[in-house]
Amino acid sequence: MEVGVVGASGYVGGELLRLLVSHPKVHINMVTSRQKAREYVHRIHPSLKGFIDLTFSPMDMEKLANSCDIVFTSVPHGMANKIVKDLYDRGIKIIDLSADFRLKNPKDYIKWYGWEHPFPELLSKSTYGVPEFHRDEIKKSQLVSCPGCMAVTSLIAIKPLIEHNLIETDHIVVDSKIGSSGAGTKSNAGTHHAMRYGVIRPYKPVKHRHTGEIEQELGLVAKKEIKVSMSPHAVNIVRGILTTNHTFLKKIINELELWKIYRNSYKNEPFIRFIHDKKGLYKFPDPKFVIGSNFCDVGFDIDDDNQRLVALSASDNLMKGAAGSAIQNMNIMLGYEEMDGLKYTPLTPV
């Protein structure tokens, strides 16, 4: 299967290439970059030296469509939609890693992103790319939109709680900690080492755009409107997300019952792991132990005094939060084994 990657010079694009070069059933045919056109890929992504000998191509839609069976688009929000529309009209399968097709209501793009969607007719044809939510739709879809990294980490932890009507849906609080790679390769004053090192920095503490995705997807599960308050923080790691999801129980449930619910909900999911250890240091999910993998680790604790259930989830923002999910979606779309190209144990220590 011939694969193309549009916008492959960033962190997510590099991670996509890392996974694709080892995938047993695909061949990378074309890799594009506006800024790095005609440079060797391994000069921008030195870790890929010896694995890929391509140069970045300038964008050529005709060549891309004629030489690739499936295309990943990994360009900034607001720039992907025209590329995706052109490829879609040509019948090419697309996996988009921008936010341009995640939300189903065109009005939500005005609310969360501040711009009017130029192709609202495509929103209903796009599938939100979380296999744990939409596997059957992904199988049949021509266009899959990968989720936001913090959104998917939170969604996986909360979904079973709503499915089983365990929590109040008008008061969910999502607290996310994310590493510096989540900011991408474009530098600014806050991303320089002297300013970034050692921080625990709140950013967009209200109305973060991933809130829209979480409300949309949990609303589909609940079949009603969901209210989510989300506050992300930049922390002193390179890769990884830890999400602490504060939810409030409708009635007290014991720990054993809750574990059964989680395990039954995700018993057939290859990339969901449960962290539950009464002893030792590793009692709860920790992003340190998912780095380089497509796993999302899930755990919880119950605050009986306040009828509060704290659902915790950890992932690698470049893997389950981006490139790993993209490859998982590709495997489903093409009928491959879901773990093809993703059978990596996490790297440790990192």
Where are the regions a protein language model picked out?
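C-terminal helical cap and adjacent loop that interface with cofactors, partners, or active-site loops
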Residues: 287-350
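Short secondary-structure transition/capping segments
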Residues: 12, 74-85, 145-148, 219-228, ...
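Short, well-ordered loop/turn and helix-capping segments at boundaries between secondary-structure elements
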Residues: 22, 220, 332-336
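C-terminal substrate-binding/catalytic lobe of Rossmann-fold NAD(P)-dependent oxidoreductases
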Residues: 27-67, 169-171, 175-176, 180-311
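Conserved active-site and cofactor/substrate-binding residues in soluble primary-metabolism enzymes
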Residues: 11, 78, 125, 152-156, ...
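Predominant activation on well-ordered alpha-helical scaffold segments within soluble catalytic domains
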Residues: 17, 155-162, 211-215, 259, ...
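Short glycine-rich or small-residue beta-strand-to-loop segments that form or flank ligand, phosphate
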Residues: 2-5, 145, 244-246, 311-314
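N-terminal Rossmann-like NAD(P) cofactor-binding subdomain of oxidoreductases
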Residues: 1-198, 203-205, 301-304, 340, ...
